[in-house]
Swiss-Prot record:
Entry coiled-coil feature ranges: none
Subcellular compartments: Cytoplasm; Mitochondrion intermembrane space
Region (Disordered): 1-22, 83-132
Segments carrying motif Cx9C motif 1: 31-41
Name of the protein this chain belongs to: Cytochrome c oxidase assembly protein COX19
Length: 132
């Protein structure tokens, strides 16, 4: 691509690719659930880098890597290693969030996922659950 410059000088401009390659859009919505939960967490914590949001970010990136929507990368290079509370929430083979905090009867400890998000966020950021 050529660009015009004053005086009739033409220079060729060559675009440079992103450092980690291209990131295809998720047209089929394969990772939309993770993206939505991560963005909700970020909104709730006022865009602070809370540990529970980092866990959701890791799950979102794992989904993107598993579905070839981004290149596979090690967690250390992404800064997502040994996150606190990471073992409480895992990713199953069908890319759905599983909460390992279940009762003996197989039911979850809480029926409201937003309340779980709020409690986790408040525990990790030191705020009280009645504020906001």
């Amino acid at each position: 691509m050529a660009t015009g410059a004053p005086g009739g000088n033409f220079r060729t401009w060559t675009p440079t690719p992103p450092e980690r390659g291209s990131f295809p859009l998720d047209h089929d919505g394969e990772c939309k659930e993770y993206m939505t939960k991560y963005l909700t967490c970020m909104k709730f914590t006022e865009n602070k880098n809370a540990p529970n949001c980092r866990i959701l970010a890791k799950q979102y990136l794992k989904c993107r890597m598993d579905n070839q929507l981004m290149e596979k990368s090690d967690w250390d290079s992404l800064g997502l290693v040994n996150l606190p509370g990471e073992n409480d929430v895992e990713l199953d083979h069908h890319h759905h969030l599983n909460n390992n905090n279940t009762k003996a009867d197989g039911k979850s400890g809480s029926s409201n996922s937003n309340q779980n998000l709020a409690n986790t966020t408040n525990n990790n950021t030191g705020t009280s659950s009645g504020t906001k």
